[in-house]
Amino acid sequence: MYDVAIVGAGPAGIYAGFRLKEAVESGADISALIIDAGPQVQKRHCVARELGRTCSKCPVCHLHSGWGGAGAFSDGKITLSPDVGGWMSKVTGQERLRDLLGRVDQVFLKFGAPSQLYGSDDERFELWSRRAALADLKLERNVLRHMGTDLSMEVMSRMYDSIRESIEVRLNTEVVAINRDGGHVTGVTTRGGEVIQARAVLVAPGRRGASWLAEQCSSLGIAVSRNPVDLGVRVELPADVMAPITDDLYEPKLRFISKSFDDPVRTFCVNPRGEVITEYYDDVVTVNGHSMKDGRTPNTNFALLVSNYFTEPFKDPISYGKYISRLANLLSNGIVVQRLWDLLHGRRSTPERLSRGATVPTLKDATPGDLSFIFPHRILTDIIEMLKALDRLAPGIVSMNTLLYGVEAKFYSSRVETDENLQTSVRGLFVAGDGAGLTRGLSQSAASGLHAAESILSSLGFR
């Protein structure tokens, strides 16, 4: 029997592992296991991305599963602002989260993250904050480090080698069930039928495992609450248009309230000189973006997302988001790309029209089309209104050279109800990260794993 079993080797699981490793090296007699359905980070390969093809729908998606989780293939932004990247402050309080993020940052630095900080210059932030306000936008403080996808994978690989010195890691092993006896967790069962017993279990399956975790919570009688689903587009344009603000802040976090519908709209995942990519969630293909530390493109991309909150009797926002995404898949066999200029003038984009613009699409297999056949009028209106506001902040956004890809969707899992220690109503069962609906990014996910690990150590009588 293990003292602790961690399901998921993404940022939450890894940082929980680091905290347990620290306890072991301080003399605690702890046996711990990290389990993940995917392979080691250096063995993770996306055939579709490498060959420039449409998603192959592999049984185990290497973009989301394996050591490092989705974070290994992300843009590698280490966000240090407690207001960005999730809802952990509601669990821990602002000061505790700030401390956790600082400790997360120190570990990243130890394993090779760059020392350069973006967004820490108060004077530049205030300048852009005033300019944003004049354009009806709100700029959020977002202090971060940028690793890029290439360096992110290297850092995760070094972490793998370090954790294995004290913690057992079992990859290519899928957990299918969480086990309990009465009101206490007893372990997990793998797809191969192996029952792994543990005194405490931390479940951190990432967004890829969100639906599975929701099913497990239902069978275990654990309450969950609904998070919103964010739907929108990935915007791609010449990097020079955004350079004045991205050179200062790297990733400006901008919020907007639409005039027509009073809906919240925001920028997300800004990638200066990056590329647009696809990702796969269950049975739908969606769009995303990233950038490398090396290998820069002439384009910048970012998402514009509209938060969709649903009330009774509707209880399945994730299915709604997938429904909209499937419309794009149906019309294009994947992702639709449209010039903003064509959208504003009520016409579909064609290969010929795309070729007239200065922006060469970095997602080569996107199909030129018409996003108005995909998005509800309300969401499309929200997006267009924010693009026009952004054009006042960075002139040139509303132009013939701006491309819109759809659909970008962020399926923020149903939030698992926990106490302040991230323990569920089943004693000994803890949750963390994006898959539990607590976070939506690399840093807060890692912080949640660290917080959960310290709670587990305390519950087992270790310090």
Where are these regions (language model features)?
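Residues forming the flavin
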Residues: 2-82, 123-130, 135-463
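Dinucleotide-binding Rossmann-like beta1-alpha1 core, especially the glycine-rich loop
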Residues: 58, 65-118
